[in-house]
Amino acid sequence: MKTTPMTFANCPQQPHGGVLVDRVVPEAQREKEIARARSLPSIRVDLEAVITIEMIATGVLSPNTGFMNEENYKSVLNTGRLADGTVWPVPLSFAPIGDRNAEVIRQLSVGDEVALTNVDNDPVAILKIDDLFDYDKTERARQLFGTTDRSHPGVDSIYRRMGDVSLGGPLTLLQRADWGPFEKLRQEPKDTWNLFYTEKKFRSVAGFITGANPLHRGHEYIHRNALEEIDGLFLQPLVEMAKREYVRHEYRMLAYRSVLDTYYPKERTILSPLRVTYIFAGPRETILHALIMKNYGCTHALIGRDHAGIGSFYDKYASHSIFDEFKPEELGIDVRLFHEVFYCTRCASHATTQTCPHDTKYRLNISGTGIREMLRHGILPPKEVVRPESARIAIQGVQPKGINNDGHGTLPVSKVVQSMFPYYAEHTRLGGSKRLQPLSPEEITVRDLEAASLDARANATNIYNDIYREYCTLADHNPGMQPAWVNEARDSMIRHQQMVIGDLQEKVQQAPEQASDEFMYQDKSEASRELEVAKALLEQTPPAVTEDVLQERVWNPLPYQRYKGKDD
């Protein structure tokens, strides 16, 4: 199959490996090739394989032109590179499962062609076989995922989806998969290169790939940082092939659109779904995503904390540290790594530990898992965590909906509270004092989730507002800016406390040295102690800010006209 490769001489980026792969049969030859495929031996493949085939053929996984031979397979598995040294983090292997497929494979040889058909037995692609080889499933799991634990979804997929013999060779795509509701939003690399650099004339584009969560404020923090210096923002929510509990794809796309339409610069932001096979390879998958962004034409890759993370299998910053294994020029894309984003009520802004010095008692965490769980409990997360435009749509599409008979969603309530409200177990309120005893996970119930949510709604913005008010009252010396009611209240407090002190002074004078009834009457010592406390309260009462006080703050050593340049 011959196609004319795209040229990138005038672009600020190049596809990985230098050539954007195009293994899609030309339209004029398609019907003929489909008919020829029907005459070939056939192997039936599942939807995940169909998606991978399409990604290879359309250049998403350049420089790969098909499934890997044994040499490349082993090189990638052991070193994270193709046999020629090109960085490639995950093996693209094809080992069909099933007795019928195994029988077909036994009759194939190097040089043969085989049709790959979907569940409806329609030819999807033709594979020309360059290699057939056995592989070790346990070794694959250990090298790729760092574990052989079947509870890891990637490990489970090896044993559940893969046969014993792997076929390598170039692919020719005959029919694209139907993207259903996302078909109208589908963009292949050849489309985005043209959009970025021919139509929009961008000189830089930041890519961002995200999974099962609706657009939240942590994402937005990363996006806005990028838009300060990069021309375009290319957002690719992953659709299809997700984990079992998630926000359904169409709702996530709608949630994205609702926020982008309202809060993002329209000419600089592009939303395009990405349909991929979930590999669940943690840090290695992060490298893959960066190279996918590169093949779509992005000059920059935005990587958050725990990108492509799988539960507790990997350190939360493993997706960052893996980039230390490769030189920037080998990757060919500017990778921007972002720490965990949270909302600090003391800073009154979104921040990371790199920029915020405050204690966790002031924080609202932004946890994708926690967000989904709150939606299941029927609670919109705090606006500082997810914009209501996004949450309102996402709550309609969360799967599963509601909670189980045990009062929990897919996680115990205590984990939800801990993931979203890190202060709650130890502090009485957001930014508040410590509890006498921290709450144990067993003590935390759905009522605590409700209480923490209401606390955040009421006080997330109040903390900094209260601080600001205190500073304004003290520092404003424009009389028109002083709140008269506050000064009136302070005057009243002072007068009333002076009245209390006057009465207590009389009481001390009249009190006996020893009271006849220690519950009904006070002796001089006790009355004196009350007087001391009352005087301390008076001293601690802030004074009213009068015009005389304000005038004392405004003075200059020279006549005012001198500051305007008039020395006469």
Q: What do the predicted segments below correspond to?
A:
Residues 2-432:
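Active-site cores that bind ATP or allylic diphosphates and position pyrophosphate for catalysis
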Residues 465-496:
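Acidic, low-complexity intrinsically disordered segments
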Residues 476-483, 513-524, 543:
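Charged, low-complexity interaction regions
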Residues 491, 498, 505-507, 511-515:
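Long, leucine- and charge-enriched amphipathic alpha-helices
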Residues 551-568:
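Long, low-complexity, intrinsically disordered segments
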